[in-house]
Structure formats: structure tokens, C-alpha cells
Design a protein with these regions (language model features):
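N-terminal substrate-binding region of glycoside hydrolase catalytic domains
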Residues: 20-41, 71
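Flexible loop residues that form catalytic
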Residues: 36, 62-64, 114, 248, ...
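Active-site acidic/histidine proton-transfer and metal-coordination neighborhood
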Residues: 79-210
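Glycine-rich, proline-tolerant flexible connector loops at the mouths of alpha/beta enzymes
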Residues: 33-55, 119-120
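Histidine-acidic metal/acid-base catalytic patches
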Residues: 1-24, 39, 50-52, 96-110, ...
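Short catalytic-loop micro-motif centered on adjacent basic/acidic residues
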Residues: 29-35, 180-182, 280
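Short glycine-enriched loops at secondary-structure junctions
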Residues: 7-11, 60-67, 114-116
Length: 310
């Protein structure tokens, strides 16, 4: 299934139906309702869904956006927060997202699990890489500092994330809605790759919990030498619930249209299951012309016509 994320155009619309119609003009008939969606857009999307104008593959947490948050901020509340009330708010909003998915007969929600409260080093690594210093002593020093600091303090936050998951998976399981734990772009975010593997093992008897592969996020880590994209996909293949599709221009400019950056989609898609949602998740800065040209190339390579999604 090929779908298109509403993150591309939700911020410029005041009517959900108009938002959907703009996506239809690109050739997509299925959407992922993304985070940052104003609650005022839901009636129009519901109308489009009920009139069979659009299909909804899934929903990205938090959806709709919390009314008290005036910008698109999917990490405004985290399962890993030191503040109990914020952890509870994150859980409650996630349960609301599951309810949103139920309204549209959607099959999944995408989750961010949280972050490790530490000084952000990933941006420094990206700046060094951008200036061709990815093999310098300064780079290795910052990278090792990041890895050691994170490893030391991470366990508490993993346990908080698991505690939150345990609370929301009951509702998800009752309604057969998959919880896709998303790969993140910054190493300070949670989970990292070792933790993701551990989580998949921990929830191996819980069918609704799985891995959500974000091509752009993983490529950014690949560009920093934190992992190998191809090897990681091979390892996670049995757990993949779906993918976010976007490209990356060296080393960290993500949410570009496919084939405009460094990702070798032709090779990597050999590791992707055939029966999962593939969601185009693009920056609002991407133009219709860019998207249509990219989509044409996509269809020619993968023999996929998005207008014939089922």
C-alpha cells in the first residue's frame, strides 16, 4: 500500500476536505493522518472518508494535535519525561490517537517513544560531516562522547517507555491496531538500534507491537557512521510494520522527495516486505512539481501505480 502523509499540507489548510483534495490531485488515494493536525480539520477528513473519497492507512501520534500546543510538535509530551503528569498526558494523547485510528478503520499508529535528556551532540557530528570532517579526530571524540554518555543514562528512560507502551497496547490490541515504534534521526532519541532490537524481543508475543522504518532518519545515522542502512534493514525485516519514505541530502537534510538525495531505494527495497504501508512523508517545502516527477520515477522503477492502491 502506498500512502501520503498529511504533514505535507495540513498546516496551510483550514478545511480537511480541501487538504485531502490537494493530495488526491497528486494521484494518491490513501493518506496517513499525521501529527500536527488541527482538530478543526477532522470533520472534513471524516466527510472524505465516509464518502469514500479517501482511504486512511494509519495515524501518526499525536493526532489530533493537543489543543494547548499551537505548533506542530510531536514530542511536546514524552513517555520518558521526568514529570509524571507529562508522561500521563503523553499516554492519554496516544489513547486518543488510537481512537482516531479506529474512526477511520486505520491499521496502525506511528509512535515516538521519547528521548534521553542530555546535551545534543548529533548536530555537532552533522556539522563536522557537512564540512568533510567525518573522519577527523574531533569527529571521533564527539561521537564516542555521545555513545558513552547515552549508554550510561539510558536504562531509566527505556523502562519509562516500556511502562507507557504497556498501558496503550491494551487498547491497540483490542482493536487490532499496530503500534509502529519509529526509528529516530538523532542518537539522543529513543530507542537507538540496540534498544529497538531489545524492544522487539520484549514484545515478541505482542503482535501489534513492531518496528516503523523511517528511511530518512536511518540514512542520517548511516551518514554519521552510526549504522549501515542496508544491514539494519536486513536485521529488522521480520519486525517492520511500515515505512516513512523520504530522501536525504548529505548529511542531514531529510524529508526530500525520493531520488533527490543519497538513498539507494532500489537496493534497500529488496529488504522491505511487500504487504506493508509505504508512506510518503515530505516537507511542506516540497513542490507539487517535485513530487509528481519523483512519483513518476518511482512508478517506473517499482511498477507501482498509486491510483490503483488496494
Amino acid at each position: 500500500m502506498i500512502a501520503f502523509s498529511t504533514c505535507w499540507n495540513s498546516q496551510k489548510h483550514s478545511d480537511g476536505l480541501a487538504m485531502v483534495e490537494e493530495i488526491l490531485e497528486l494521484g494518491f488515494d490513501t493518506v496517513e493522518i499525521s501529527h500536527g493536525l488541527k482538530v478543526s480539520l477532522l470533520p472534513g477528513i471524516i466527510r472524505a472518508f465516509e464518502e469514500k473519497i479517501i482511504k486512511v492507512a494509519g495515524v501518526h501520534n499525536f493526532c489530533p494535535s493537543p489543543v494547548e500546543v499551537l505548533i506542530d510538535a510531536p514530542d511536546c509530551y514524552e513517555f520518558t519525561s521526568h514529570r509524571e503528569r507529562e508522561r500521563k498526558r503523553a499516554i492519554d494523547l496516544t489513547l486518543t490517537t488510537i481512537k482516531t485510528a479506529e474512526k477511520f478503520n486505520a491499521k496502525y499508529i506511528v509512535l515516538h517513544l521519547g528521548s534521553i535528556p542530555m546535551k545534543r551532540i548529533s548536530p555537532k557530528l552533522e556539522k563536522l560531516a557537512l564540512n568533510d570532517k567525518g573522519e577527523s579526530k574531533a569527529y571521533e571524540k564527539q561521537k564516542n562522547k555521545l555513545l558513552k554518555k547515552r549508554q550510561k543514562i539510558a536504562p531509566l528512560y527505556i523502562e519509562r517507555a516500556k511502562s507507557a507502551l504497556d498501558k496503550v497496547l491494551i487498547e491497540a490490541s483490542e482493536n487490532s491496531i499496530n503500534l509502529g515504534i519509529e526509528s529516530r534521526s538523532a542518537y539522543e532519541d529513543l530507542p537507538n538500534e540496540e534498544e529497538m532490537i531489545s524492544l522487539m524481543k520484549h514484545y515478541e508475543d505482542t503482535p501489534v507491537v513492531g518496528y516503523w522504518h523511517d528511511f530518512g532518519h536511518i540514512q542520517r545515522k548511516h551518514n554519521l557512521g552510526l549504522l549501515d542502512h542496508d544491514e539494519w534493514l536486513s536485521k529488522m525485516n521480520p519486525h517492520i510494520k511500515g515505512c516513512h519514505l523520504h530522501d536525504v541530502k548529505w548529511p542531514h537534510r531529510d524529508h526530500q522527495v525520493p531520488f533527490s538525495g543519497d538513498i539507494n531505494f532500489t537496493e534497500l527495497f529488496k529488504k522491505i516486505p511487500n504487504d506493508i504501508p509505504i508512506v510518503w512523508e515530505l516537507s511542506h517545502r516540497r513542490t507539487k512539481k517535485e513530487i509528481l516527477e519523483s512519483l513518476s520515477k518511482w512508478n517506473s522503477i517499482f511498477n507501482t501505480n498509486v491510483e490503483k492502491n488496494t
